[in-house]
Amino acid sequence: MGDYFALVASDLHLKKRTWSNRPIEGDSYFAWEQIVDRAIAVEVEVVILAGDILDKQINGSGPIVKLQEGIEKLGAAGIKTLFIQGQHEYQEMPWASLSKHAIHLHRNVVAALAPSIEAAGYTIAGIDFQAKERLQDELSYVAETLKYPPDKTILVMHQVWEEWMGERALPQGKLSDVDNWLPGLGLLITGDLHESHVETEPIGPPLDASLPAKWRRNKILSPGSTCMQSISEPEDKYMYFLSSVDGSLEIKKNTLLGRPFIDWPFIGTVADIEDCIREYYTVYEDSQSHAEQHSIPAEICKPLVRFQYDHSLSGDAHRLEKLVGDSAYTFWKEHAPKDNNEEDSVVVSGNNVTMESLLTSVECEEDVRQVAERLISSGDPYEELKRWNNEQADESH
């Protein structure tokens, strides 16, 4: 075995077309292939996947076959794949029973297979995604059944944590809940947040004011997603390696290669557009050279480009759009500079306010806007949403 005993990743969302309604394909598969190859090269004992490996809307066999191929390749190298479920996977997960090299870490497996999920002196436990009302029971169960002390335990979870995502999504638990039941864990690995985040200082103020002032906070690793699945996500993606050095758990991040991403500086004047037209292909060619240098597959080489421009330049921006053409997947966002005292709110004046007029007043990504427009214009939004889901499933085959 090598210096590292585990490779950690999360939120693969394996499917051929990673984005909802853009023909952007291959990204999640390419990330998974890198994870498998890197784990074998480094000679880890286990690969840990912290949920949302697959996606509920994907009913075809392609993603499952791709996942199984990777698990079998790891198994042939003597590497076990340890996983939990996120909220994006079906609960039955029949694929898991197809490989002797994949181990479901959820609580029943913790109790039954503990000897086979120890690595480098640590026991690795896991809890599938839980609704908020179930989380306390699951944490209590793990706390009661662990065979190792907390500081020699790695716990894998997948939750919408209030401390991290409370303003963006409906929280399904608090990180302080884990601190309360399992203080001083060797490491808490958590999925769902598509941003990489590491907290390595275990001593500090309590996350919950009701906890004692000297409470020992857990070390936390959020691997983030393995490829961009939204233009609002961070472009940098990672897998992480774990090692045990003198009894201490060390974390090292390793960059995942991915589709080139060009985030153009804000375009506020016609002169900015002229500069952009002159400079675009230089930047584009640099991105292609980088992709070629790192042997990025051809289907991953077409870059993502995000342009934000002043709303008064809509007509001029069309010239830039024509220049870019099919050389990149482009994302355009009109941006009206706000007064410093202006609040983040939408004001629609007039007596004839409609859903359509409200939608045009809200800033959102183009794919989200298109789906919203379909639902608004449909006589039966529920049936329209089902049709849209079926379209996404068909596109992934």
Name these PLM-found stretches.
Residues 20, 57-221, 225-230, 234:
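His/Asp/Glu-rich metal-coordinating catalytic cores
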Residues 5, 45-46, 80, 152, ...:
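Residues at the starts of beta-strands that form the adenosine-phosphate
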Residues 244-397:
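Accessory, non-catalytic peripheral segments of nucleic-acid enzymes
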Residues 3, 43-44, 123, 184, ...:
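Short loop/turn motifs at secondary-structure junctions
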Residues 41-43, 147-150, 294-300:
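Glycine-rich phosphate-binding loop signature in dinucleotide/nucleotide-binding domains
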Residues 1-66, 70, 147, 378-397:
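N-terminal active-site segment of His-dependent metallophosphoesterases
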